[in-house]
Amino acid sequence: YGSSAASDVYKRQALETVLGYIIALILGLGFGIAISFSSILRRTLYPFFVSIEMTPKIAFAPLFISWFGFGLMPKVIIVVLVCFFPIVLNAILAFNSLSNELTLFYQSTGASRLKTFFTIRLPAALPQCFVGFKYAAINATVGATIAEFIGSDKGLGFYISIVTGNMRPDLAFAGIFFLTVLGLTIFGFVTMMEKILIPWHISMKRINK
């Protein structure tokens, strides 16, 4: 591996991780909101999501690799899987924990359901949602790297295996350091968005003291 090839490996790892996390964030929050508003979806999808969350997602990696090859897609799918469930389960908990009396009172003033959602329900649910966002951020780099260790011919996990076998621990530690920085960057960005969106929450006030 030359410097150019190593740079491509790092870029690929970042792309897999960030893309998978963003997709999981959109899907997880979307399903969480939908399930919280629908009793039918709550009875059908929630138990399914809980059962899948208890299944080691990495066990699916060989299947995805056999279906989609060694390209980008199976790695992104693994990242989506390991990030999706913390997000969706915390979103369901967040939106189902809100007081119905408060939302009904606000609607009684003439507010529409859409306005009630953005004014009352979403702000109140965001603190718990961010718990899922941050937990998923921790999982993202782990999921992408393990998927590459299991089956890949290009990614950073594969690169670390190769340079370790070639007795280059310096390059292996450089890869591990990059993974740490990547994970901290994603986590830090989520934390920054948390401070911007919910500065009023007690957890933010304690952090900022």
Q: What function would you assign to each model-found segment?
A:
Residues 95-101, 105-125, 165:
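Short helix-to-coil transition segments within interhelical loops
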Residues 19-49:
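Transmembrane-helix boundary motif in ABC transporter permease subunits
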Residues 157-194:
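Hydrophobic alpha-helical transmembrane segments of polytopic membrane proteins
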Residues 1-6, 10:
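Single conserved hydrophobic/aromatic residue that forms the stacking wall/gate
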Residues 35-40, 68-70, 82, 150-152:
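Short helix-capping/hinge motifs at transmembrane helix termini and TM-loop junctions
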Residues 195-209:
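Short cytosolic juxtamembrane segments of multi-pass membrane proteins
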Residues 50-86, 93-94:
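Generic hydrophobic transmembrane alpha-helix motif, especially the helices
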Residues 77, 81, 114-146, 179, ...:
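Transmembrane alpha-helices
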